[in-house]
Amino acid sequence: PMATRAVIWTLLPGAGDGKPAPYATMKESMQIGEKKGVRLAHALYAVAAQASGDDAKLRDAFRSYAAASTEDKPANPQFRLIDKMAGLMVRGVADRYWTENTGVRAGDEGLTTFWDDKQEDSSLDDLFDGGSGAEAPAENQPAE
């Protein structure tokens, strides 16, 4: 219930006056939901982040949901339908976000990796391709 209230606090001007910080409240609700095996608060966080237009919060919502949806964190059987609906909500928000920015829906890794994420540059690549990308040491270069 607190996650739902927090979403309302973010969406309706003046509704959050005198209330706790809405995103902190949603994060607390997400932790409770993870322990109980229900990720509805994650979906509400994604919806609120989408409505706010804050890319950082939206990506955090996607990554938080993905981290909470691993095989070692199964859904509570009593609330499987609600959990499944929450997953569909997050996937729908992700698909819309991806489509607006890239023209295609979110792929399998679309909740954790994004099109503009910087790739880690690995110097190990040169070790395996024979060093073709690296300059020869000065001693092996012809004198000028």
Q: How would you name each of these model-derived features?
A:
Residues 26-36, 68-73, 94, 101:
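Alpha-helical junction/boundary sensor with strong preference for TPR arrays
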Residues 1-43:
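Extended amphipathic alpha-helical interaction segments
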Residues 7-16, 49-55, 98:
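Short coil/turn linking the two alpha-helices of tandem helical-hairpin repeats
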Residues 17-31, 56-69, 107:
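Alpha-helical repeat scaffolds
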Residues 72-144:
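Terminal, low-structured helical/coil segments at or just beyond the last alpha-helical repeat
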Residues 4, 8-11, 44-48, 85-93:
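"A position-specific structural signal for the A-helix of alpha-solenoid helical repeats
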Residues 34-42, 47-53, 57-74, 78-80:
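Outer membrane beta-barrel transmembrane domains
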